[in-house]
Amino acid sequence: MLADILQEAEEKMKKAVEGLRRELASLRAGRANPALLEKVLVSYYGTPTPVNQLATVSSPEARLLVIQPWDRNILPEIEKAILKSDLGLTPSSDGTVIRITIPQLTEERRSELVKVARKKAEEFRVMVRNARREANDKLKASEKNKEASEDEVKRAQEKVQKTTDNYIQIIDKILATKEAEIMEV
C-alpha cells in the first residue's frame, strides 16, 4: 500500500521532469533545433497537423532548419503556419524545400527567454510539489484508516520528501543548462 503511494508519486514527478524537458526544447536558443517547430500546426486538408508529421525537419547547420515536405503542394501552407507562429522565424522556399535561418538572439530577447524558461521550470516544480502533497495526503489517510502505523507513515513521508528534493534538484539542473544555452553568444 505505502509502496504503491510512493511509486505513484515518483511517476508523477518523472512525468513533470519529462514535460519540462519537452517544453524547454521548444524554446529557441540561437541554434536550430527541429523541436522548435513541434507546436507549429499546418492546415492539411482542413485538419491542424504538426509540421513534423508532414515533412522531414532537419538541422544541417547550427543556425539553419530545412523542412522537406513529403507532399510539395503543402509547401505554401507550411510557410504560412511558420509565419503565423510566434517564433519570429522567416521561412524561404525554393519550391522543393523550406529553409529557415535562425537569427542571432539580441540580449533583450535572451533575457526574455530566460524569464520564460524560469516560469516554465516553476510550473513543473509546482507539479512535483503537488505530487508530494497528494502522496502525503494518501499516507495520512492510510494511517487514519489503520492501514499503516504512525512510524511507517513517517518513514514513507521522509522518502516522499527525499524524492521531491531529488526531482526539484533535477529541474534546477535542467533550467541552469537551458539558461546557459540561451545566454551563450
Swiss-Prot record:
Biological process (GO), any one: translational termination
Superkingdom, taxonomy of origin: Bacteria
Location(s) in or outside the cell: Cytoplasm
Cellular component, GO annotation: cytoplasm
Matching InterPro entries: Ribosome_recyc_fac (IPR002661), Ribosome_recyc_fac_dom (IPR023584), RRF_sf (IPR036191)
Keywords of the record: Cytoplasm, Protein biosynthesis
Keyword Protein biosynthesis: yes
Family: Belongs to the RRF family.
Purpose: Responsible for the release of ribosomes from messenger RNA at the termination of protein biosynthesis. May increase the efficiency of translation by recycling ribosomes from one round of translation to another.
UniProt-recorded name of the protein: Ribosome-recycling factor
Originating species: Moorella thermoacetica (strain ATCC 39073 / JCM 9320)
